[in-house]
UniProtKB/Swiss-Prot annotation:
GO terms for biological process: L-leucine biosynthetic process. It is found in: Cytoplasm. The lineage of its organism: Bacteria, Bacillati, Actinomycetota, Actinomycetes, Mycobacteriales. Has two major domains which are separated by two small subdomains, that are themselves joined by a flexible hinge. The N-terminal catalytic domain forms an (alpha/beta)8 TIM barrel and binds substrate (3-methyl-2-oxobutanoate) and Zn(2+). Subdomains I and II (separated by a flexible linker) make a three-helix bundle that packs against the C-terminal domain. The C-terminal regulatory domain includes two variable number tandem repeats (VNTR) in this strain. The regulatory domain binds L-Leu (the pathway end product) in the dimer interface. Its cofactor is Mg(2+). Disulfide bonds: none annotated. PROSITE patterns: AIPM_HOMOCIT_SYNTH_1, AIPM_HOMOCIT_SYNTH_2, PYR_CT. This is 2-isopropylmalate synthase. Optimum pH is 8.5. It comes from Mycobacterium tuberculosis (strain ATCC 25618 / H37Rv). Gene3D superfamilies: 3.30.160.270, Aldolase class I. Keywords: Amino-acid biosynthesis, Branched-chain amino acid biosynthesis, Cytoplasm, Leucine biosynthesis, Magnesium, Metal-binding, Repeat, Transferase.
Amino acid sequence: MTTSESPDAYTESFGAHTIVKPAGPPRVGQPSWNPQRASSMPVNRYRPFAEEVEPIRLRNRTWPDRVIDRAPLWCAVDLRDGNQALIDPMSPARKRRMFDLLVRMGYKEIEVGFPSASQTDFDFVREIIEQGAIPDDVTIQVLTQCRPELIERTFQACSGAPRAIVHFYNSTSILQRRVVFRANRAEVQAIATDGARKCVEQAAKYPGTQWRFEYSPESYTGTELEYAKQVCDAVGEVIAPTPERPIIFNLPATVEMTTPNVYADSIEWMSRNLANRESVILSLHPHNDRGTAVAAAELGFAAGADRIEGCLFGNGERTGNVCLVTLGLNLFSRGVDPQIDFSNIDEIRRTVEYCNQLPVHERHPYGGDLVYTAFSGSHQDAINKGLDAMKLDADAADCDVDDMLWQVPYLPIDPRDVGRTYEAVIRVNSQSGKGGVAYIMKTDHGLSLPRRLQIEFSQVIQKIAEGTAGEGGEVSPKEMWDAFAEEYLAPVRPLERIRQHVDAADDDGGTTSITATVKINGVETEISGSGNGPLAAFVHALADVGFDVAVLDYYEHAMSAGDDAQAAAYVEASVTIASPAQPGEAGRHASDPVTIASPAQPGEAGRHASDPVTSKTVWGVGIAPSITTASLRAVVSAVNRAAR
């Protein structure tokens, strides 16, 4: 037995640590309704953010009241920050494919590499410059540390580019000052300002390029705010930006250390207090260590930032950078243009997966395989009703559904707006109900099941789902159709209709006669009857051979558009079968024609002189090129299901 097959072996594979149920005392003041207990986790090794860095208390904060109504300036860093985090960094071909995708999507600032640290990155920067691959409205960005020789190499890589952003950085956090640089505040600030002077010096040597500068106090979230401002202001004095040629100050959550509201407070404080703010583009670069990079980016943007750096689908060091797809489509879902084209999310995802050689998770917002899929019965029912309501509203407004305001429960956006279809919106497993079954039968198979039939058939599917490996597995649309056909369309015992001849009434109030050839338990016989329509006449004919059918409800519809469309008919009937049923002997009733009311009501339609003593109420379904044949097949289906 393999580890995957043995829970014990799987548990043992984790080594010495054993999960121990928390059994310590409750915390002081813990309410009686909370039964949780103290764990044995070594929480004493960690401390609150306010103790590790500093408390951030912003008075009169304004960001909680702001509504995001515009897109930030985006910068995609997939080719640098994303690439450096890959198990196998991108080849030149994969880099080029990612770059071309980002350009097509509409990103205007793209960080293309760290050319002073990697020959591959250097060569790629030269390639896209020399091949003229950079559109006129796109600015490439390159990263460098503040060391002079690395800055020189960076400018060499960008020589000949029409426009370029040189992004220089050094870490300013309390922890890195102490354990990495072993330097004081003034010494760390000098690293930044010396780097800025070197950048200005190098830019003068390459006048053919329009240079811009970005500075990041790396590990900003672990840096005191006053000190972060001090360093940025000092760098700004060296660069001397103007409103027309602003500097980018990028404030990265290099490591996410606290809740997004604290990050937002810090961004608003910096936005208020940075010198020469009108000449500064305030940029965010959130990582996802605590799983809240998207929230941090959105709140930080509301707090005064102008620009956001991130990666498609959140690739990046450790838990990744903020996801540009999620940020952009969050805006889109609230009616704000992200100024990026996400209209073919699957092409974007496939390209990213190819370039990164990493899969996008099935649950990743907007792009995962399952994000527009509902398994829950109540969710499926609500989605089904929402889509139907959209269609009805569009018909009433005499417009296309695609022009209607999107309002469908559980789906924040229309999957079709990002290139998905509705095929996978509802999938059925043991958690599903009638809504999901009805949706798939309608969208995949063209059958609009009446509500009570939905309930009946969903019970069939429930049994199949619960029996899938005993674990509540999924039932595919094909498996669902096979089950439906076996349950409603396939049975031919005890009754099978062979053919019929109908003499229709000349007027609406007249009598219709039918002569039909049927098989009863394999024996062919001819039956005849009359009524106020073909269905009533057929019911009357069946009564003469032992099948007492009272039609309780009836539905019909075309399964598609066009002259060659199949018709579907659904009959809910109370059926009593005489035993044994022999032609002309069992179940005979008065020879008066049978009348079926329209609409048929329980107990009224198809009733004969003597009420049945015992009966089964069942649904029958018929599908045929003509609605008459479909309705007769539905009656036969009901009889055969009642005989089970």
